[in-house]
Amino acid sequence: MRSSVRSALALAVSVAFLPVVTVVTHAHFKLLEPASWLLEDDRGDPQKAGPCGGSNTDWGKPSYAVTKAVGGSKLHLKVQETIYHPGHYRVALAVNSPAELPPDPKATTTDSDRGPRSVSAEIQNPVQVPVLADGLFVHSAKADAPFETDVTLPNIACKRCTLQVIQFMEQHAVNNPGMFTYHHCAVVEIAPDSKKPIDAAWPKER
């Protein structure tokens, strides 16, 4: 009997002094449509680095996927959030180089014991070139189903446009790289619609 009591006490003491493990949750998403330009794992990684994904240790492997579309038409967008975090999405388009993509959304932050923490971000309304849509899929609860919508493409000629889809995360600590944003891109070949005027606000393909 005494042996059993001593064993129980020893177990209780050992459990009491086990290290406390803090779980840090990071939001992640997969770009389902159009096809991502990188091969993504089940969580959508690598996706932290801007403007188009990768990380400090893994810049990703190309998928060589190219989505064909008609200028002035709608392109279907579908993303799956694999790890929940509140926030919203933005879509932008670069004609000649990913360098044409806009900076990540400017964040409002608050101080925490672990450094800056995101509160919100600027949302363009109305959007300006090269942003196609902003403030998409605003959510503050976990969603099991994919987020889907259509975005209207400019009527331009573009053999290898870069379509960028990013997620801004609220209530999130700073990531390195990427700060408060996760990034995915797709290569889109756009053929202009001859029945519509060319969108002069967009850069010409070089």
Which residue ranges define each predicted feature?
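Structured recognition/catalytic domains enriched at protein termini
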Residues: 28-206
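Bacterial N-terminal signal peptides
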Residues: 10-20
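Bacterial N-terminal signal peptides that target proteins for export
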Residues: 2-11
